[in-house]
Amino acid sequence: MGRRPARCYRYCKNKPYPKSRFCRGVPDAKIRIFDLGRKKAKVDEFPLCGHMVSDEYEQLSSEALEAARICANKYMVKSCGKDGFHIRVRLHPFHVIRINKMLSCAGADRLQTGMRGAFGKPQGTVARVHIGQVIMSIRTKLQNKEHVIEALRRAKFKFPGRQKIHISKKWGFTKFNADEFENMVAEKRLIPDGCGVKYIPNRGPLDKWRALHS
């Protein structure tokens, strides 16, 4: 018996049902890689960030997340080069979906119990997404803005429902505004740390502040 279509599991009807010691035998999620491109690029190399934002409360299958990841990656590699971007899938499929298998062969009515004991077996995993939640983010150089929008537009077709593309006012994957970021780095209030930054507050030990500004 093949996989049931994802439209059967589109809506969030039940409570979250994750893999646990009570819910065993769950198949592995199709999506295994959540970061692609130049993951180790320093925070100051990729200032532009684009998000795909969900406009519905629904469930997205791990197969759909994998298809969208491949689609966005293929377009970005072709248009910006394999080292010109960093894609991050922001959803993880933890919710387990079930199927109550029905026999369709001749004489099935004598073998199966119908809706008696209908709690199904695990079939796959989905990610539950809320309105306004980010599904996928891409950071890159400022001149690649149109390519980011097009890559996310193509990836949107892999998902049900409605999504919006949003170009962030923040710097890369950080939470600091792009127009203030460089000034904060110059004042040593932010210290680059891989693809993120460390925020140095105004309060704290004076020795640390002196060591930074010496």
UniProtKB/Swiss-Prot annotation:
One of its GO terms (molecular function) is structural constituent of ribosome. It is found in: Cytoplasm. GO terms for biological process: embryonic brain development; regulation of translation; translation. Citrullinated by PADI4. Ufmylated by UFL1. GO terms for cellular component: cytoplasmic side of rough endoplasmic reticulum membrane; cytosolic large ribosomal subunit; large ribosomal subunit. It holds the Pfam family Ribosomal_L16. The modification Citrulline is found at residue 32. Keywords: Citrullination, Cytoplasm, Developmental protein, Isopeptide bond, Ribonucleoprotein, Ribosomal protein, Ubl conjugation. There is a cross-link at residue 188 (Glycyl lysine isopeptide (Lys-Gly) (interchain with G-Cter in ubiquitin)). Component of the large ribosomal subunit. Plays a role in the formation of actively translating ribosomes. May play a role in the embryonic brain development. This is Large ribosomal subunit protein uL16.
